[in-house]
Structures are given as structure tokens and as C-alpha cells.
Amino acid sequence: MSLGSTPSTPENLNPVTRTARQALILQILDKQKVTSQVQLSELLLDEGIDITQATLSRDLDELGARKVRPDGGRAYYAVGPVDSIAREDLRGPSEKLRRMLDELLVSTDHSGNIAMLRTPPGAAQYLASFIDRVGLKEVVGTIAGDDTVFVLARDPLTGKELGELLSGRTT
């Protein structure tokens, strides 16, 4: 069975074992982003396998397939641990913020419900603007100077906890 074969007609439908069917499902999910069970059943039919929705649901469940929705993208079926599922597809604003903080954050401090982020000269406004656009639920807003960003924590979070969250450290 190969992907991209001629469309199936009733004469060329293949009887197939559950194991072979599930192996083909894994192969299809590995090669392309499948966004619905209808799409997957059509792809299986193209390979000569006619399957009911109930059987397909059961197969997906047994394979541990789940829908993954990348930030700003369309959900698709994936199999395996989240870390091994097309990591680049899961990189949305939050992942970009993590990378940006890793690159720009020099140090953190805090007072009350304010986290103070120190950056290299000239980077604070860029970082603050991105924090605002990401829309973290823990953040009320930001104020930036040249190399310092004040980030106001939303209650009940403290400035210390917010600084730890943003810096990736926990104590």
C-alpha cells in the first residue's frame, strides 16, 4: 500500500487486518497533517481501505492519536509524546516569548506585584511590546525604558512569582 495510489473503487478495496490498517493510519499521519476523521477516512479509501467512523475513532484512540492545535493554526491529528510532535508547529507567541526572554533577559528583580526585567540597552521596549502582544493572563501590562521593563502582575500573583515565571526559574 503506498500513499498517492489510484482512487479506490469497490473492485479494488482491500481486506486488511487491524494491525495493517493502524500501521497505514500511522504512516498517513506521519506524512501529512490530517485535520479530520473524514479526511483520514478518504485518505484510507484512496489506499483501498473502507472504514467506518466508529472503527476509525477506535483506531485513533488505540494509537493514542490526539488533535494538536498550534498557536494560530489549524488542529491536526498527531501520535506520540508532545515533545516529538512537530515541535516547530507548536511554536506560537508563547514559545517565541520564551526564546526572546532567553536571549534578552539579563536579570530580574521585584517589588510588590511588579517584576522588573533588565535587558541589554535598547531592548526593553521591544521585549515589553512583545509581552503585551502575547497577552499572558498573569500580566496586566508593561512599562519600558531603555534597558528595564516593569511588568505588572495580575492578582494574586506577586512580582517575585511573575519574575520567576518569565525567567523560567522557580524557587
Curated annotation (Swiss-Prot):
State the similarity comment. Answer: Belongs to the ArgR family.
Location in the cell: Cytoplasm
Instruction: Name a GO CC annotation attached to this entry.
Output: cytoplasm
Instruction: Give the record's GO biological process terms.
Output: L-arginine biosynthetic process; positive regulation of DNA-templated transcription; protein complex oligomerization; regulation of arginine biosynthetic process
Q: Which GO terms describe its molecular function?
A: arginine binding; DNA-binding transcription activator activity; transcription cis-regulatory region binding
- Top-level taxon in the UniProt lineage: Bacteria
Function, in words: Regulates arginine biosynthesis genes.
Arranged from A to Z, the UniProt key words for this protein are:
Cytoplasm, DNA-binding, Repressor, Transcription, Transcription regulation
Q: Write out the coiled-coil annotation as residue ranges.
A: none
Q: What is the protein's name according to its record?
A: Arginine repressor
